[in-house]
A protein has these predicted regions:
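Glycine-rich beta-strand-turn "strand-cap" elements at beta-sheet edges
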Residues: 2, 38-49, 75-103
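Short, well-ordered beta-strand segments in beta-rich or mixed alpha/beta enzyme
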Residues: 2-8, 38-68
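Short, surface-exposed ligand-recognition loops at beta-strand->loop->(often short) alpha-helix junctions
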Residues: 9-18
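A cross-taxa feature marking solvent-exposed loop/turn segments within ectodomains of secreted
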Residues: 15, 30-32, 46
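An amphipathic, aromatic/His-enriched active-site/gating alpha helix that lines ligand/cofactor pockets
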Residues: 20, 24-35, 56-91
Length: 103
């Protein structure tokens, strides 16, 4: 499984706006190979808010196809938001080991 992350720093007090922005971008759920999406918020930084966008894909190729898709272009074509600080920090991972709770 392939995981893409994007670390985004925003001005303090704009977390709800960023969350709503991602809430309105559900088109990725229809993309081939898409597994799931999570938006994580870091706690405790007094100077800014930090989020980690996490998307999981069946393969890196599925992720790359999405990056070239019309839905990706649409999701990233809106006006710039002035509360985002700089550019996101992208990272990619391959899951090598995972555990689940025993029931």
């Amino acid at each position: 499984m392939f995981v893409g992350t994007n670390r985004i720093k925003i001005k303090k007090g704009y977390g709800k706006e960023l969350e709503e922005l991602f809430r309105s971008r559900g088109e990725v759920a229809r993309e081939p190979g898409f597994v799931d999406f999570e938006l994580w918020r870091q706690e405790g930084d007094p100077e800014h808010e930090e989020y980690l966008v996490v998307s999981r894909w069946e393969s890196e190729e599925h992720h790359n196809q999405w990056l070239r898709s019309d839905s990706f272009k649409q999701a990233h074509s809106g006006p710039p938001t002035d509360y985002i600080m700089g550019h996101g920090e992208f990272s990619n991972y391959q899951i090598r080991l995972a555990y689940q709770a025993e029931k």
